[in-house]
Amino acid sequence: MIVTDRGSLKAYRVNETPTRGPSLQLVQAFNITDAHGRLIDKVSDSAGRFPVTEGAGPHRGPASIAERTQLATETDRRIQKELADQIAKIVSQNESDGWSFAAPAEIHAAIVDLLPSAVRQRIVEHVKSDLVKVEAARLNTHFRSLRQI
């Protein structure tokens, strides 16, 4: 089972216990440093930026906003690609037939689309929710495949 959000990822091994149902063991945790902090803190050339003016000309406000939006979009794309690469590596190293995946709805589809098809086809359950901060003992309540019958 893998749970992720925009900045971190946790992989759990599901161990079946005959009396208590499934138990989860954390096997890997991963944080992406680019996902944390403000965009202005990451742009190294803030001293050389052109002033933004309200009037017409090459340095008016909207161009500056568009540049920041492009940079934020590119950063999001890189983070999602890095998460997909880490997921592919974890799933490839694991011998189980299927795995469950949880991510916030706003990034879930993008990450799944970036996964190699062999990894994507092994997903047995999709949960569109941010479960990274949920403690392991309570995660099984969010996955139908882990609930006791």
Where are these regions (language model features)?
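Terminal alpha-helical anchor/extension segments at protein ends
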Residues: 1-149
